[in-house]
Amino acid sequence: MSGKGGWAWWWARLPLCLLLSLYGSWVPSSLGKPKGHPHMNSIRIDGDITLGGLFPVHGRGSEGKACGELKKEKGIHRLEAMLFALDRINNDPDLLPNITLGARILDTCSRDTHALEQSLTFVQALIEKDGTEVRCGSGGPPIITKPERVVGVIGASGSSVSIMVANILRLFKIPQISYASTAPDLSDNSRYDFFSRVVPSDTYQAQAMVDIVRALKWNYVSTLASEGSYGESGVEAFIQKSRENGGVCIAQSVKIPREPKTGEFDKIIKRLLETSNARAIIIFANEDDIRRVLEAARRANQTGHFFWMGSDSWGSKSAPVLRLEEVAEGAVTILPKRTSVRGFDRYFSSRTLDNNRRNIWFAEFWEDNFHCKLSRHALKKGSHIKKCTNRERIGQDSAYEQEGKVQFVIDAVYAMGHALHAMHRDLCPGRVGLCPRMDPVDGTQLLKYIRNVNFSGIAGNPVTFNENGDAPGRYDIYQYQRRNGSAEYKVIGSWTDHLHLRIERMQWPGSGQQLPRSICSLPCQPGERKKTVKGMACCWHCEPCTGYQYQVDRYTCKTCPYDMRPTENRTSCQPIPIVKLEWDSPWAVLPLFLAVVGIAATLFVVVTFVRYNDTPIVKASGRELSYVLLAGIFLCYATTFLMIAEPDLGTCSLRRIFLGLGMSISYAALLTKTNRIYRIFEQGKRSVSAPRFISPASQLAITFVLISLQLLCICVWFVVDPSHSVVDFQDQRTLDPRFARGVLKCDISDLSLICLLGYSMLLMVTCTVYAIKTRGVPETFNEAKPIGFTMYTTCIVWLAFIPIFFGTSQSADKLYIQTTTLTVSVSLSASVSLGMLYMPKVYIILFHPEQNVPKRKRSLKAVVTAATMSNKFTQKGNFRPNGEAKSELCENLEAPALATKQTYVTYTNHAI
């Protein structure tokens, strides 16, 4: 080879040459092994033309090991099928007469990297080696046995293995025919131009599976794929076909790692359960992964939940479902149309250790198949394993069922044989044996003959290839069924461009012939609207019409009018109930009780005061302001009845007037009293003259002025916003429309209520301030301290009222809670004033009349001086026990005051 083309050829193969130089069989010692002796990792059969073979005799190893357990069906059955086909061709006088086919068969160990390493054996003979620098000990050149030239390869099984091997074989133009690889990627003739297969591409299989899913009325499925070309390409093809055909949505696409960790399959099942409606699982996985998925489903107690649909890697194999029959029941599988080869059954059943020495793995198969050991040294003490006798027979002493791909292995070998036969006929016409034009065989020419073969396969099916090297799509459809305690695969249909499915033959766990559901979304219930999922036309979310919405049509929710709420099933609207506080409501019991008792007590006090109007205690309490205060207390109690009465124009008008008026009257009277006391004592500190406006008439005038301000505000309110009742649908518009209520109430908002009571609160706070300022006045001189205690207690009541009243604004019982809170607070305020200011006086009047006598009169100067000195002395009260200093001082101050001849304004003690 010379010129640019030659250099390009060598540069393209330079990396491979470097790899081969590291490979163990490249050294002369290994190449010098005598022909016909089996290698440790391969079967070598002599012939005029050598075919390569790649089979997964062992599974993938773990913990750094290349190979694992023996695979009896996928490995030994398929390998023996190739040997069986070679024997038939070599014994056929009409096919390749006088030409013997040999073989070099390797174990891929179900791993693409190991298969790559093994397949380097096939290209050794195609690379010439320069041995000029290699000399033996005698100085002569070494004798190197040239490796056999492999003209074509049968295999591999897994798509990922075939892809890896095809990348090397195409460099050396070695045709390859696979018997099991179905990944759509291998149909790319620009990348895998020397690859052909006797099984159809997964593109056909994916279409068939989509047709099955649609026939079963499933529209929501998950996919599960083994990592690698076969699984990932198969799922990708299925998804693509489902999109093209429509009507099928993919819930999840889960990938099984090439080297799964402990617990990985349990996580996969857990993830699949996240979309529990997707009960149908489309599986493109190797049989080891399939089995571990089924085991994980059983551990998760999901037997009967999932409905499996397996690709041809599952097919009708027993290994994935062995002792997992309950979990696998109902599984629908697909397999390229095949027929059991009876001749192979007879051939394989007759294999023994004596007549099958060419298969170097047959002894291992024998031990595994019959559960015995060939060597006594391998038997362990106490073990139940027996020694092999060589009298065991396959199918008699062990179970036997032909593996599903045996037919395709035989067809692949025959396709290679027919291509070589046609090539020999054209290149060596009339010649016996090989002619120079076929020695060596040109791979490019052989590929053309392979693509043009057309013959009846071992099962009678036509064997042909299209321009991409793919076989036509013909599938049988199976279902794994259990009956009477036994399980088996039943043919339920076929697919050849179109689906032919016998649904009446199908059996489902728990439901018999009734089709199980694996649908994206259940029909929406009344009151729910459909919200389609973007990119998934068959899927939708059922979203309930929330809040005050009702269902207009399948896709729309609309809000009810403001005075209506949705019905129970949210298909229409209905009026919102209107509520008010009833007289017989439990919420009205306490306010009415307090009001009735309060009014009775107030009237009792008024009657007592009127009857004993001229007694010293009544006079000393300031009769005029006392009656005003009692009137305010009465109105506070009476307001309760207005608050509970049904709101109308009259009731709402009276509420505006009297709700704040009663409190204003009460606190105006108390404020006038405390202000009078404060001014008297403050004036006394500066002079002996009496302050202004302390007469009863002045006090009444001040009180009515304060009250008139409240009335003036109410009048302005009536003018600006006339009173009326309203039905408030917003106030009790709860989040749950079932509890929504229209509240019949007066047009008094929370803000209006604050303004209405605000003036009364201002009077109350001011009165409290004066009560604090006069707290130091001796209690024997006035009623400032009882007023102070009254105001302190009242403040506490209203401080408790505020959070309760405004904190329940969002409650469904807001009307009841706020009305009850307001009326009880008003009644308690009135009760505090009535109880602390008047009940002690009534008690003395009725039960201790001896105390209802006039007191000594004191001058203003004496009273003020005593109060002032008392305050100062209180700070030093610890110098005299029991307050003796205070009493003594007061008495010392009294004598000069009585003896003086000056005229002072005098007041009775209680009058102050």
Curated annotation (Swiss-Prot):
The chain crosses the membrane at residues 587-607, 625-645, 654-671, 700-720, 752-772, 787-807, 827-847. It is a multi-pass membrane protein. It comes from the Eukaryota. Pfam families: 7tm_3 (PF00003), ANF_receptor (PF01094), NCD3G (PF07562). GO terms for cellular component: cerebellar granule cell to Purkinje cell synapse; glutamatergic synapse; neuron projection; parallel fiber to Purkinje cell synapse; presynaptic active zone membrane. InterPro entries: ANF_lig-bd_rcpt (IPR001828), GPCR_3 (IPR000337), GPCR_3_9-Cys_dom (IPR011500), GPCR_3_9-Cys_sf (IPR038550), GPCR_3_C (IPR017978), GPCR_3_CS (IPR017979), GPCR_3_mGluR4 (IPR001786), GPCR_3_mtglu_rcpt (IPR000162). Belongs to the G-protein coupled receptor 3 family. This is Metabotropic glutamate receptor 4. The gene is Grm4.
